[in-house]
Each structure stands twice: as C-alpha cells, then as structure tokens.
Amino acid sequence: MQSQGQNNIYTVVKNYIPKNVMATKNRAKTWLYGYNEKYDLIIISKDGTLGEVYEISNVKIGLPKHPDKFENDDKKKENQVWESKELPKVLKRIQTIFQWHEAPPNFKSQWVDYIESEFDKREQGHWFKNNGVPTYITGTHYMYLQWTKIDVGHPDFREANRIFYLFWEACKADKRSFGMCYLKIRRSGFSFMSSCEGVNQATITRDARIGILSKTGADAKKMFTDKVVPISNNYPFFFKPIQDGMDKPKTELAYRVPASKITKKNMYDIGSEELDGLDTTIDWKNTSDNSYDGEKLQYLLHDESGKWERPENILNNWRV
C-alpha cells in the first residue's frame, strides 16, 4: 500500500464532510448514489452510507462506510490479502437457471444464501482487509477478480486497478460523465478489465447493445472471441443469461433469457420474468470513422484507440 504523497494516484481527503452531517446521514443511510452537488462529491456507495473521500485526478469520490467485521478477520495481519474463491463443486454441475429450478428444495435452501451474497457483492462491492487495512473494491472490480478468468488464471489484486475501478464507478454514477479515457502501460490488464465490464453490463441490462472497436477489425474480433466470449462462458449459472446461438460465437453474443436474482423469496418460483428476453447483445465492428454511426450503444469499448491506422481517425469516430 502506498503512503500518501504528491506522486500517489489518490489521496484521502480528511474532514471533507462536517462530522455532524456525516453521522446523521449515516445513521439514516440517506447518502444517495451519484453526484452530490452540495458537496461537489460523487458518491459510489450503494448502501446509503459514506466513509472515506478519495481524490483521484481532481475528482472527489465518496466510498461506503466500512463494516465492523470482515471475511478475513480470522487471519493474521500479514496473511490478510485478496483471495478468489472457487465455485462450490456441486454448483458447477448446474449450467442454467432452468436446472436450478429443477433442483430439490433442500438443495436450494442450502445454497441460496451463498448465491444471494454473490449478487450483493456484485451490486454493492466488497470489503476485505489487506494487511490489516480495510479495503473496498467496487462490484465491477469484484466481478473481475472473482469471476473472470484471464490468460494466467485469476487476476491478481492490484492497488492501481482498485483505484481505476473506483474512478470508473464514479464515471457511471455521475450523470454528467460521458465515460473515461485511460492511458495505460503494457500488461496492465485493461483489455481483460474492459471486456469483463462489457460482459458484466450486458448480463444485467435489458434492450442494450455493447460495442467493441480496436486499432483494426481483426484486433476487435480477437478481443471478442478470446476475451469477451470466454469471460461470459465462465460465469456461474446464477449470473449467466441464456444466450442465442453457439457457445463460441464469432461476431455477436446475444443474451435472451436473463439470469434473474435468486433470493429466498423466489428460489422456488419459475416466474414469467425468467422467460422474458434481455435482448442485449455484444458485438464488434471493423475499424472505420463511421463505425456504429447512428446506433445507440449502452457501452463502447475503444481498445488501442491511439493506434488507429490512417486514413481512419479516432477523432472522427468519436464525433459519430
């Protein structure tokens, strides 16, 4: 963990919110996700609480208040690190939500708390102790670390990536934002991180389209087939909608039947919502100034955008 200083990628802003205001609103859990104009603060907490305020690239970002207990409290300080957990073997045998509905009631009762907890972490983020320090990761970061397989297996926890995801969550929370431009070093994991976010968004969003562009059409296709599709296929059944077509599509990944949230209240039900299509797709296009012209996108991944080959120009495409 870095010590604070002018070369850090973030700083913790002390006493940014008056203590009496912080205490009152935390008790009532009335801090709202999004931009808070009064305090010029982007709140990424989704549980109504506010804890530390980070400043990242001159943007004030409010994290949730840390809990009193952590999953790895039972470990010695020097052994407290991020650890991904394998899906329980019995749940690996279930491939679709339909197989879950056919499972015996006692089996569902045994595993519903685990599944509910995973949905909560995906939505609200996750706390753990890192060498004794309470550490918050966003839900998107959790999905990357826990449920994404990359070329070397599970991703490592990196503090720089944590800050990236905090800033990205602020971009999503702030309705004034058009997105994020990220300049990176090699092997930083961005292609996998952005692919993970594309799949994460697609599997929870209805009637949306997610696009991929890269420096060439061949690179965009490779990102789709080698990263996006495997990430989707490796999701556990409770996060994975039913998709149209092949398991390994080459041009479009189409989600139809959604993976609705499993809770104690609905774990025995087969409601009509499971049969309504998501109608969300992920696809890629050849690199061109007018790629995706006139098409509404929920999320556009521009990979290697600084390497477009002439005569194509990323600036022209951005104006489309």
Q: What is the meaning of each model-derived region?
A:
Residues 2-320:
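Phosphate/NTP-binding elements of NTP-utilizing enzymes
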